[in-house]
Structure formats: C-alpha cells, structure tokens
Amino acid sequence: VLSGVGHSARDTYEMLHKRNVEMTVKPFAIGVRIEHDQAVIDESQYGVEPSSLGLGAAEYSLVYHDKETGRTAYSFCMCPGGQVVASASENGGVVVNGMSLYARDSGVANSAIVVNVGPDDFGTHPLDGVAFQREWERKAYELGGSNFHAPAQTVGQFLGLSPAPSVQDSTY
C-alpha cells in the first residue's frame, strides 16, 4: 500500500507508525516566504510595465546549487500579485503559504525560498522529519509573538547587511 497523505497529516503518520506500518524517511524542503514590490519584479523580468506589452504580473524562478555541501536553495510557489496567508495545521506553530489573486494585481509578489533537508539534518527515525518541522514551526510561532503572527525581517537583515528597522508592510 502506498499512502500519499500531505506533509501536514502528522496524526496519520503517527497512527500508521503505532500500527507498525513500514515507513521510509524522506528528504524535504524547508524555508521562508519572501515578499517584493511586484513592480520591481516586473521591471526585472520585462524591463517595462507589463500592461504596455499586454502581459500580466511577472514571475521568477531562482536556483542555487552548493557543490561543497550538496544543498540546493530555490524559489518555490512564486505568487505574482498575491499575498502571504496563514497555513498552520497545529496549535503553537506558524506556517505560511502564498497565493496569487485572480487578477494578480495586489502589487506584491511573494515566493517561498527553501533548502533541501534530509536525514543528516533531522535523523533516521520515520517520525524525525515531523519533529524537525514542528521544532521550526514552534520557533517561528515564538519569534512572531506566540499569537500566530509570522516573524518578519528585511532581506538586508536576513543577510546581515543592514540594521534592524521594523518591517513596514507585509500582506500577512
């Protein structure tokens, strides 16, 4: 039997494990969601206002392969003209996702920026990946004020290039 439940079906994983169903550890990706002014992305991709070309809001895709570590960081689920939305499946954890509005006209682009992780990062027990996710979701919850607000910072802060002004605008 092959089960294709989603990554948030943790109660299902735990129930199957308790019933001694054979489970295999799988690598996955974990990361953050980044927001940009959509006009900056449009200019970067098209060089002009997209409507002047009869186009909608621009998308992008980024990939970086680190040959030394074997890790890959990449953009995922890029949402032009959208917003960041809450996606937590458990109390005490913060998870966010992105979505585009139908017209893709919110003026804000967002994308997940993720990195691959595997058993070397979280362990070889079948439920170690679940524990790893929960740990990071709990840390995000605490950093956001323990009220389901997502922690936020600028790219400059994330990269250690700028002091810590407060984030002025976020769709979340």
PLM feature spans:
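Residues forming the flavin
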Residues: 1-172
